[in-house]
């Protein structure tokens, strides 16, 4: 190897400048340098591959691929060429070619550990588990190292996970993997913790829980040291699987004696105690209670154990919360069994009060007590809050001054009480004026609290931020219940003000995004969402807050950008996850590999991914098709085929985080599982409608063909008639989806404001756009029938088409009428928004586009017939040949279309003029006593909404003007 390395040194030196150019992004210079080198050294394959990388990065993919394949055909075995080709194939998203590369290299250099290892990893990237198993064993035979052997074992497990037949998995793959590991155990060759983890994983998947437990408790279990309590946690999991409740109880008791603050073991302890009571288990008369020691099998034992932990905690210098919370948890469980009074554990209200006295100054106090407030009787809630307020250190209130805390500890305590007040529903039961008084008080406390955070960094949150958030939540209540927009404008004002003091507060930003979107203002949202700096999976979990409104508010450029941003994450997921899997193999983190695979599948099947993909393609068609390029070219560039459905309907995963907003609402007002279920149902229905619409549009260009009337046999031969069959089937499915959607919308489901976002489906139906689009697709079907049958003897079809054209025009006028009205209205100094007008306008523009694509197809059918008749007239010089009325009807329809679009363009100009004429000075909040600071933010908020509306109208108007131009080209 040394000699070979020495021979390659001059080549490395020659290649170095090309590598440098590529690393610096100077691809053109890299290509030039490679060309120079290849003139002198024609056989320097690596230079050719590096040139191909340069070509790939400058957009010359085909040329790059040809060069790469020339080198690959030579089956190189030098490191430089192999690594360069690997990089190139990765950039081309062709990882399967890397496997062929190393398969050839391994044949030529069969004893190379490095090449065998690269081959294994190449298989891992493409998920070739069987070949991975073989490659792992081949590697182990060359270099008998344990990791290689266990790579092969893990590949068997992956075959079992990916096998569709569960029986095959449990009778072939897993037993074989088990035998392979047992062989190593018998030969005493198990060396690493990862190998024990793998053995445990196999036994667990086979359902051999007792054997898995024996492994963990035995000598091999001693190797499990990398994680704290790893061995105990695995034992606990197996005890639960085997329903060994005495062992579960004894182990959790023992672990709690070691650390009385470990909450997970309290839950296991209680679970096991009540299971043992249920089973009437009694300890044996002699010997140990269980493998893990003493067992508690009665409520008395549990009560004494918890009381002992509290006594022990009170004598410790370290404050622990676990025992106190465990007492409340035990009360809850005893109550559910109907036997609390016997054990006299105390009054939950008093226990929570004592807990507050100990931990009220900690931010965790609220989240700790939140779980147990249902133990309080409704009648005692106000008394409980007053009791808590009684121990909060506040200044003495005066007529013009609130009772305020003197330090951060006092502020945290008071904040905890305020949060509990909202959670117990005391704010919700107030009338409007009381709620507005609460908002005023909370904002005064917020302003006062800012004094404690003057030294905070910009990346830190202010101590009093929750006061501001709570005030906004109360204002949202006023807005939603009374329908008064003054409250929502004030909420936006407070959030914008809060953001200046806490620029990193994600909750402020999320609420601003949500409210601006509901008001129909997308412009400020893009920067707000961007400043959240969402990382990785968050693009899927919270991305819906942005992409739901991206296409619906008329800001097409920003919508495209938002969709691209989301899609970039999903597309990189496949590549990134492969790298994680490879790292897991390298470092022996075998238990993580199935998790990575499941994670990748979860993202590939993401509901959000399918939605964004569909909306992005519809958006591209809307902006480009028949404007900059033809509809056919647009569809071809997207690789769309009407017969292909790329949505994994059966495996769709809802990865949205519907609890992303902090909420202090009582349980009955919060987001429930039922809300989440209904939201998923609604989202899936809407996705189906959008997906079918896209597929129907994608089928239009394929219907255009040279017409040979009444020659249906020929049509069937060239496959065109099957195209119309596909479209008719899709139209049928669309009508079913629409009916299902309408039934759902009739339920009038109201989601909590801080919960799921409703889809656009309701607006799609109410605006009349749905009916318009469906009818236009029916027109396609009729027009195709006319096309294949000819003009003669098709009077019925022609009449049907004429009626459809007239009806479609009337429907479109109806849709346009829903776009009337101003986006912003000012009456008596109050501002009222009408975002529905904007959403209807955007749907109207989309519907116009769909109708124009359909009309373009109609034109392509009718024009040849008209020309044919005109030719006959000229040829025979006969005036008796009558032109069928369908041509006049179509021309009238096109004229009508132009009028409707022209009116819409004028209407948008009118909306723009009205918006520009609005003077912001007139737009003041109802509350005249607001501070100068608040007034400033109020102007900012209203300015942002006004500017956003204007931007939306400009983009929508511009697109409509382009569509008007395409209408003028519709001539037969």
Swiss-Prot record:
UniProt key word Cell cycle:
no
Protein family per UniProt: Belongs to the MDM20/NAA25 family.
Record's keyword annotation contains Lipid metabolism: no
Q: What is this protein called?
A: N-alpha-acetyltransferase 25, NatB auxiliary subunit
Query: What function is annotated for this protein?
Result: Non-catalytic subunit of the NatB complex which catalyzes acetylation of the N-terminal methionine residues of peptides beginning with Met-Asp, Met-Glu, Met-Asn and Met-Gln. May play a role in normal cell-cycle progression.
Summary of subunit composition and partner proteins: Component of the N-terminal acetyltransferase B (NatB) complex which is composed of NAA20 and NAA25.
Q: Where are the TPR repeats?
A: 11-44, 45-78, 79-112, 114-146
Main location per UniProt? cytoplasm
One family from Pfam that matches here is NatB_MDM20
What keywords tag this UniProt record? Cytoplasm, Repeat, TPR repeat
Instruction: Pull one GO CC term from this UniProt entry.
Output: cytoplasm
Location(s) in or outside the cell: Cytoplasm
């Amino acid at each position: 190897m040394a000699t070979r390395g020495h021979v390659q040194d001059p080549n490395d030196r020659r290649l170095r400048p090309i590598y440098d150019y590529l690393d610096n992004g100077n691809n053109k210079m890299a290509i030039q340098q490679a060309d120079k080198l290849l003139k002198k050294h024609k056989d320097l394959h690596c230079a050719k591959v590096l040139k191909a990388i340069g070509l790939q990065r400058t957009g010359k993919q085909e040329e790059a691929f040809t060069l790469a394949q020339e080198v690959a055909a030579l089956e190189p075995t030098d490191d430089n060429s192999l690594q360069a080709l690997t990089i190139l194939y990765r950039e081309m998203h062709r990882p399967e070619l890397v496997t062929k590369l190393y398969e050839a290299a391994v044949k030529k250099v069969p004893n190379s550990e490095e090449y065998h290892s690269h081959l294994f990893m190449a298989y891992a990237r493409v998920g070739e588990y069987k070949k991975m198993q073989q490659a792992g064993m081949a590697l182990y035979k060359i270099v008998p190292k344990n990791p290689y052997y266990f790579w092969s074992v893990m590949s068997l497990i992956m075959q079992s996970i990916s096998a569709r037949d569960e029986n095959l998995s449990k009778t072939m793959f897993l037993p074989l993997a088990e035998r392979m590991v047992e062989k190593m155990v018998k030969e005493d060759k198990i060396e690493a913790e990862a190998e024990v983890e793998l053995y445990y994983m196999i036994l667990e998947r086979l359902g051999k829980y007792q054997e898995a437990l024996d492994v963990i408790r035995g000598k091999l279990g001693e190797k499990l040291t990398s994680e704290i309590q790893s061995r105990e946690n695995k034992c606990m999991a197996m005890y639960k699987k085997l329903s060994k409740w005495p062992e579960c109880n004894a182990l959790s008791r023992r672990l709690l004696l070691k650390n009385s603050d470990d909450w997970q073991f309290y839950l296991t302890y209680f679970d096991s105690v009540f299971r043992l009571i249920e089973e009437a288990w009694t300890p044996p008369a002699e010997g140990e209670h269980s493998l893990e020691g003493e067992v508690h099998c009665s409520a008395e034992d549990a009560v004494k154990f918890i009381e002992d932990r509290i006594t022990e905690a009170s004598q410790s210098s370290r404050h622990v919360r676990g025992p106190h919370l465990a007492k409340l948890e035990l009360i809850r469980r005893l109550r559910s069994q109907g036997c609390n009074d016997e054990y006299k554990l105390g009054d939950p209200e008093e226990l929570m009060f004592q807990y507050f006295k100990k931990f009220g100054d900690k931010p965790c106090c609220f989240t700790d007590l939140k779980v147990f407030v249902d133990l309080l009787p409704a009648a005692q809630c106000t008394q409980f809050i007053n009791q808590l307020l009684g121990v909060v250190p506040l200044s003495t209130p005066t007529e013009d001054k609130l009772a305020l805390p003197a330090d951060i500890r006092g502020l945290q305590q008071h904040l905890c009480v305020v949060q509990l007040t909202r959670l117990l529903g005391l704010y919700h039961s107030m009338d409007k004026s009381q709620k507005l008084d609460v908002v005023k008080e909370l904002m005064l406390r917020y302003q006062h609290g800012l004094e404690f955070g003057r030294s905070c960094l910009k990346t830190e949150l202010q101590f009093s931020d929750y006061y501001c958030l709570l005030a906004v939540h109360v204002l949202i209540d006023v807005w939603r219940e009374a329908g008064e927009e003054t409250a929502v404008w004030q909420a936006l004002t407070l959030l914008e003000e809060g953001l200046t003091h806490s620029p990193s507060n994600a909750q402020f930003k999320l609420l601003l995004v949500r409210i601006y979107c509901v008001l129909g203002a997308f412009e400020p949202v893009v920067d707000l969402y961007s400043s959240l700096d969402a990382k990785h999976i968050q693009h899927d979990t919270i991305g819906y807050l942005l992409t739901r409104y991206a296409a619906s508010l008329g800001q097409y450029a920003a919508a495209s950008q938002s969709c691209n941003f989301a899609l970039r994450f999903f597309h990189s997921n496949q590549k990134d996850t492969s790298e994680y899997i490879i790292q897991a193999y390298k470092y022996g983190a075998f238990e993580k590999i199935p998790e990575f695979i499941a994670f990748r599948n979860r993202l590939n099947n993401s509901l959000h991914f399918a939605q964004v993909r569909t909306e992005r393609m519809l958006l591209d068609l809307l902006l480009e098709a028949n404007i900059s390029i033809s509809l056919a070219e647009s569809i071809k560039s997207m690789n769309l085929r009407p017969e292909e459905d790329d949505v994994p309907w059966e495996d769709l995963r809802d990865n949205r985080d519907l609890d992303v907003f902090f909420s202090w609402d009582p349980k009955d007002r919060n987001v429930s599982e039922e809300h989440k279920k209904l939201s998923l149902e609604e989202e899936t229905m809407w996705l189906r409608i959008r997906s079918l619409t896209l597929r129907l549009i994608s089928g239009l260009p394929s219907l255009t063909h040279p017409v040979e009337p009444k020659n249906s046999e020929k049509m069937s031969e060239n496959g065109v008639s099957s195209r119309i069959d596909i479209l008719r089937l899709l139209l049928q499915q669309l009508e079913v989806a629409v009916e299902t959607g309408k039934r759902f919308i009739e339920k009038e489901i109201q989601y909590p404001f801080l919960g799921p976002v409703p889809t656009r489906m309701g607006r799609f139906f109410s605006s009349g756009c749905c009916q318009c689009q469906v009818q236009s697709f029916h027109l396609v079907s009729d027009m195709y029938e006319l096309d294949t049958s000819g003009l003669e003897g098709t009077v019925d079809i022609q009449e049907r088409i004429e009626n459809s054209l007239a009806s479609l025009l009337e429907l479109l006028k109806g849709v346009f009428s829903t776009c009337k009205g101003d986006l912003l209205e000012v009456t008596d100094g109050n501002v009222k928004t009408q975002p529905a007008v904007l959403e209807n306008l955007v749907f109207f523009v989309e519907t116009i586009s769909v109708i124009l694509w359909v009309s373009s197809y109609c034109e392509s059918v009718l024009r040849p017939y008209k020309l044919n008749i005109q030719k006959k007239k000229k040829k025979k010089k006969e005036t008796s040949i009558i032109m069928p009325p369908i041509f006049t009807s179509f021309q009238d329809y096109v004229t009508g279309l132009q009028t409707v679009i022209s009116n819409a363009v004028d209407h948008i100009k009118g909306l723009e003029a009205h918006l520009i004429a609005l003077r912001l000075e007139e737009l003041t909040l109802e509350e005249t006593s607001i501070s100068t600071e608040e007034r400033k933010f109020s102007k900012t908020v209203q300015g942002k909404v006004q500017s956003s509306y204007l931007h939306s109208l400009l983009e929508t108007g511009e697109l409509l003007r382009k569509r008007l131009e395409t209408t003028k080209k519709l001539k037969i």
